[in-house]
Amino acid sequence: MTIIRKKHPLIKLINHSFIDLPTPSNISSWWNFGSLLGLCLIVQILTGLFLAMHYTSDTATAFSSVAHICRDVNYGWLIRYMHANGASMFFICLFLHVGRGVYYGSYNMIETWNMGIILLFAVMATAFMGYVLPWGQMSFWGATVITNLLSAIPYIGTTLVEWIWGGFSVDKATLTRFFAFHFILPFIITALVLVHLLFLHETGSNNPTGLNSDADKIPFHPYYTIKDFLGVLILLMAFMILTLFFPDILGDPDNYTPANPLNTPPHIKPEWYFLFAYAILRSIPNKLGGVLALILSILILSIMPLLHTSKQRALTFRPITQTMYWILVADLLILTWIGGQPVEYPFIIIGQTASIAYFAIIVIFMPIAGMIENNILDLD
């Protein structure tokens, strides 16, 4: 068996990635989220595949086809709610995974980090298009508002929006193409994940100390396979409690009303995992400025290696930057809350303050904190 595992061209790849992979001996549970994201992706692809067998991407029948899945298809309700809440679990794991990367300085593995940012954009695009497919009120108006943002691009904006819509409004053509893209993107994401892993295995994993761990590696299996399995059990338990007991808690009641272009919902808002970016978008009165801030809120992650001023990699032994980091986390939670609130006093000013704080902490305060710590610790 050992000979096959190490010699067979295909099994050898799996062996080097998941079995004999040299792994730091001290990585904590924060390193579980990579494998949990892989699990989420598999769950989403499988449930999505079964949903696609019964779904029709036509404005006249899309809403009723989703109702048909829930009422008439065997365990259709379960598949539908697993897919909807699976997206939420996916984003929870994603945010924790990125947060871990920021905390422990994993952004210094530049290829892996940039690949991760591309993956984040791809997953966000997939989730947005998936939200449009049930063709409820929030699906329709969310698609209208978000795609309309592209009209802020000078000269080509309006033409671009009409090209994406396939007409002069969000309609049948838009729904059909969104379904096509929503179906193909997870497979593209799977390919990008393999590239992400390829880059990661070039350098090896980071660890909680941020120090080089070449002298102290252990094989991935059985040590981390069993540790990941515990994470999988906890995730699945949380996931099934959410899906079976509170399936609609993260959704929007407006999406149980069929799409009506003549009736605008009182508060148009995206799913909870986009609310922080939506709050940043809304906090700028100018349309183009808002769109740029929205894109930059994610793209700012790509300049993190340039903003790293500390002589230490991780925040483990850096209390000042740690404080900044947790203020940033609190700020993101405030932005998420604001994104779901109506555009009125005092939410407008809170959103603007939180948006400025978000960029200021990353670009100004964390690099300054790093330099201060270098001086305190006399690390010239």
Curated annotation (Swiss-Prot):
Keywords: Electron transport, Heme, Iron, Membrane, Metal-binding, Mitochondrion, Mitochondrion inner membrane, Respiratory chain, Transmembrane, Transmembrane helix, Transport, Ubiquinone. It comes from the Eukaryota. A ubiquinone binds at H201. GO terms for biological process: mitochondrial electron transport, ubiquinol to cytochrome c. It is a multi-pass membrane protein. It is found in: Mitochondrion inner membrane. Pfam families: Cytochrom_B_C, Cytochrome_B. Heme b b566 binds at H97, H196. This is Cytochrome b.
